[in-house]
Amino acid sequence: MYKRFYWYRSGVTNTMKQALKDIYDSSMKLSFLKKGDTILDIGANDGTLLKYFKLKGYKTIGCEPAKNLTKELKKNCDYVLSDFWNYKNLNNILIKNKIDKPKLITAIGMFYDLEDPSKFISDAAQALDKDGVFIAQLMCLEDMIKKNDLGNICHEHLEFYSYKSLRYLFEKNGLKIFKIEKNNINGGSYRVYCNKRNKYSIKVNEKTSLQDVRKFISRVEKNKTKCLKFLDWCKKNNKEVFIYGASTKGNTLLQYYNINSEKIKFASERSPEKWGKYTIGSGIKIISEKEARKKNPDYFFVMPYGFIKEFIKREKKWLKGGGNFILPYPNFKILN
């Protein structure tokens, strides 16, 4: 699906760096790790998470198939598995380098991209030390629906998980969920802690019905109507609107709303790899944040809304000068 190239880098935003640091801190609070233990991060991206462990003397392995991220990942961990996850490839590294099985395995923000989630978890369980912990963080269905997060419905996301479905998958493959936390990452995520020792998974009350899905669709339509009405007003009144953050998930909204370069000319983006390219299906040119600020639009249309607090700090000068953020969801609003 990714053809060994992945656009997103974990270290681009301070919000995500802090979120990954929080996973490190949470792991330390469990007090089961010893210096020199092996840590494996599956879907390691640029190694932002593993860097925290490496600095404290743990042996770190990053599993990441995207070739464009390998150089940065190698700086932040001890060993790199440049392939899609499976136990066989990991075991080759363990044997070759005489490394113990991982005491901690993490899989952050990639559980919804799996073609075979059960096989993925089975291999992780096989790789995990008998006294180890597996931590997965992923967006949850309940918050996606509550927050009208249309962007989650994109080509990369093959699954949407309830707690019940997660518990089934982990238990089927010999892991029990002993702790679960919710946070605001990516609009709302579960952080799930599993091990082999517990007899049962904890219970979580979660209520998402078909009626909730129907209400979600209705709210999405209302957001769409309000948004398009406002963009039409901007065009009639010669107000310039740029996208802020040319995110993958944002393409779902752009295409569903039928927003193209006639309504929005440019998309401001921090990652240099995207500059000069165009948003898929909508044909909006992607430019750097620096270039976008020079053009000084009246409005920035925020795609990755989960980072809005960071964006407000970053664009303080522009906001004080009269700029406004457009938030398409959870509920359409103008922020100034």
Task: Label each region the model flagged.
Residues M1-E72, D149, C154, E159, ...:
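Extended interfacial segments that mediate partner engagement and assembly in macromolecular machines
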Residues S26-S27, L33, Y52, Y193, ...:
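Hydrophobic, well-ordered beta-alpha structural blocks that scaffold small-molecule cofactor pockets
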Residues K51-N89, F266, P272-W275:
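Class I SAM-dependent methyltransferase SAM/SAH-binding core
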Residues K88-D100, E289-K295:
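Short amphipathic alpha-helix with an adjacent loop that forms part of the alpha/beta core around
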Residues K103-T106:
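A conserved beta-strand element that flanks and buttresses the S-adenosyl-L-methionine
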Residues S118-V133, K316:
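A short glycine-rich, Lys/Arg-flanked "PGG" loop and its adjoining helix->strand segment in the class I
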Residues D131-M139, N324-P330:
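Conserved beta-strand signature within the Rossmann-like core of class I S-adenosyl-L-methionine
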Residues A136-E159, Y163-S165:
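Short, glycine-/aromatic-enriched active-site segment of Class I SAM-dependent methyltransferases
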